[in-house]
Regions:
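Polyanionic/metal-chelating signatures
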Residues: 122-125, 130-259, 387, 422-427
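Histidine-rich, glycine-flanked metal-binding segment
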Residues: 36-78
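Bacterial N-terminal signal peptides that target proteins for export
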Residues: 1-10
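His/Asp/Glu-enriched, well-ordered alpha-helical/loop segment
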Residues: 93-95, 100-104, 111-112, 234, ...
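N-terminal signal peptide c-region/cleavage motif recognized by signal peptidases
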Residues: 12, 17-19
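C-terminal cap of metal-dependent C-N hydrolases
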Residues: 30, 34, 41-44, 368-411
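Glycine-enriched alpha-helix->loop->beta-strand junction motifs that scaffold or abut catalytic
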Residues: 252-259, 276-283, 311-313
Length: 427
């Protein structure tokens, strides 16, 4: 089943006569997966006007006169893919510290650190991600020695300087082994620090009038944690072990005002029923099927399948190389299908479900009033050999070039023995 998208659509239908005066694109002859109760529409025409979906219907009759027409040639059309956990745009070269803004190990601050302040929309990883069909990315900071990693963002992959959609989308907190090591050496220490931090944030600024330090946070971090501590901002909790996830569920029941989602969740299937009852979403990587640590001994390729079957709100991410390979979220979804996840559920897990988790209104579906993030494919989007032919972000047809494709085109046609461009043989 595809989870219902909680969004408010614009009332009324747009008249075809009014389409011509706006920027209009019509994608015809498409197998369109809508992400709604409408399901997959064969021989569909998708009409986009001024950055929004205006109509989805069968057949090509009555197209707007001034529409740019793209023939999908029977191929798939889907909503733009959302990568729900990555560090795209925060790192250019992993081995060069000056280009790495994922963490700040020497900083006095933790929650106050905003990934948006280091995000580069023109990083070479952004077009690499976009040309694979990913139109929106959730970008998280990395812990720099504190269980509170900082605050993440949501951006589109257009590469424009205005591509950040939400520069303060969530707070990332690491529990389990990582939280224990960063909070004093044990899980109880991590939970004690979290409770103290919530108290500091909820009593800000009163308890800081005479002092700069609270029980767990500085004045600056306590102020930054305030919205999340009051349930006004999402808290992403990184946890893998079943007992750690169970503790998060119990903590959420104790603090009903908090908005919590799990990221990681390698053993989440063991507590799937509890997660479903608590309505706590989980972001998992279907690739994670081996016990990389003692908190992942129960990792299995059927984690995603078991979570979805239990009714857990489940999204997929690729976490193996989160700085450069957010695009592989599609391969993760394909692996989930290979291990029993329904094809519709897998597509939902990388479109409508992450939009729901991160509160992205009118995103992740193809229906009237939705944002026109749309991808045209040359095959099944979850097949590893398929690729996009067109990527639209807010109704704009995007460049399908990246640094890698330019290098390919530059050198692929060299004659045998020919020197690369910018190199000349000596006379």
């Amino acid at each position: 089943m595809i989870p219902a998208k909680l969004s408010t659509l614009a009332a009324g239908a747009l008249m075809l006569a009014g389409f011509a005066s706006a920027q209009t694109v019509a994608i015809t002859n498409a197998k369109t997966w809508t992400g709604t109760a409408q399901g997959t529409v064969e021989n569909a025409t998708v009409i986009m006007v001024d950055g929004e979906i205006a109509e989805v219907r069968t057949g090509e009759n009555g197209l707007p006169a001034d529409a740019e027409v793209i023939d999908a040639e029977g191929g798939w059309v889907t909503p733009g893919i959302i990568s729900p956990f990555s560090r795209t745009g925060l790192v250019e070269v992993n081995a060069e510290d000056s280009t790495n803004d994922t963490y700040a190990g020497a900083s006095d601050y933790s929650i106050a650190l905003k990934a948006a302040d280091g995000f580069n929309p023109m990083a070479t990883t952004v077009p690499v991600t976009r040309i694979e069909g990913v139109t929106r990315i959730v970008v998280a900071p990395r812990s720099g020695g504190d269980m509170f990693a900082g605050r993440g963002l949501v951006a589109n992959t257009s590469g424009g300087q205005d591509s950040i959609i939400d520069d303060d989308a969530f707070v990332l907190i690491r529990m389990g082994e990582a939280g224990a090591s960063n909070a004093g050496g044990s899980r109880p220490a991590a939970w004690a620090r979290l409770r103290a931090a919530l108290s500091d944030a909820r009593t800000f600024p009163a308890r800081f009038l005479a002092h700069n330090e609270g029980d767990a946070l500085t004045r600056v971090d306590a102020q930054a944690f305030g919205p999340a501590a009051r349930g006004q901002q999402l808290i992403l909790v990184e946890a893998h072990r079943a007992s750690d996830i169970k503790r998060v569920i119990e903590f959420a029941r104790e603090s009903t005002e908090l908005n919590i989602a799990i990221v990681g969740g390698d053993e989440a299937w063991m507590v799937a029923e509890d997660l479903a009852n608590a309505k706590i979403p989980v972001i998992v990587d279907p690739f994670q099927n081996l016990p990389a640590s003692f908190e992942q001994l129960g990792a299995t390729a059927e984690n995603a399948k078991r979570l979805i079957e239990a009714g857990v709100i489940t999204s997929f991410a690729h976490m193996g190389n989160d700085t450069h390979q957010a695009r592989l979220v599609l391969q993760s979804a394909g692996n989930a299908v290979a291990n029993g996840v329904d094809h519709d559920d897998a597509l939902a897990a990388i479109t409508v479900v992450p939009a729901l988790i991160f509160g992205l209104e009118n995103v992740g579906t193809i229906e009237p009033g939705a944002v026109a993030d749309v991808v045209v494919w040359d095959g099944d989007p979850l097949e590893v050999m398929s690729a996009p032919t067109h990527v639209f972000i807010n109704g704009q047809d995007q460049s399908m070039e990246s640094r890698q494709t330019r290098l390919r085109d530059r050198y692929l046609g060299l004659e045998a023995g020919g020197a690369p461009f910018a190199y000349k043989r000596s006379e």
